[in-house]
Amino acid sequence: MATKIRLRRMGAKKNPFYRLIVADSNAPRDGRFIEEIGFYDPTKQPEVLNIDEEKAMKWLATGAQPSDTAKSLLRKAGVLAKYHESKK
């Protein structure tokens, strides 16, 4: 089972917020997921980003591939830098 770290859209029309989830790569965007590892609210000022680093590191270590947007959010939170440091 190939897993992806990606965003799940939540909220009302024209007022989105996103949950960062781990899901099977074949599952639909807002469908079934394995675990929630954080959330992102771009509508707040400043933007709210909360990621459980421990869960994210665990899933990255097991081979979950982040989507492009999820990768940029993980980089913004400093999780990717810590992951690459732990691999060395």
UniProtKB/Swiss-Prot annotation:
The keyword Ribonucleoprotein is assigned to this record: yes
GO cellular component: cytoplasm; small ribosomal subunit
Entry keywords, A to Z: Ribonucleoprotein, Ribosomal protein
GO molecular-function terms, A-Z: structural constituent of ribosome
One Pfam match: Ribosomal_S16
Cysteines joined through disulfide linkages: none
InterPro entries noted in UniProt: Ribosomal_bS16, Ribosomal_bS16_dom_sf
Domain of life assignment: Bacteria
Family membership: Belongs to the bacterial ribosomal protein bS16 family.
Record-given protein name: Small ribosomal subunit protein bS16
Organism, scientific name: Desulfitobacterium hafniense (strain Y51)
Lineage of origin: Bacteria, Bacillati, Bacillota, Clostridia, Eubacteriales
Name of the encoding gene: rpsP
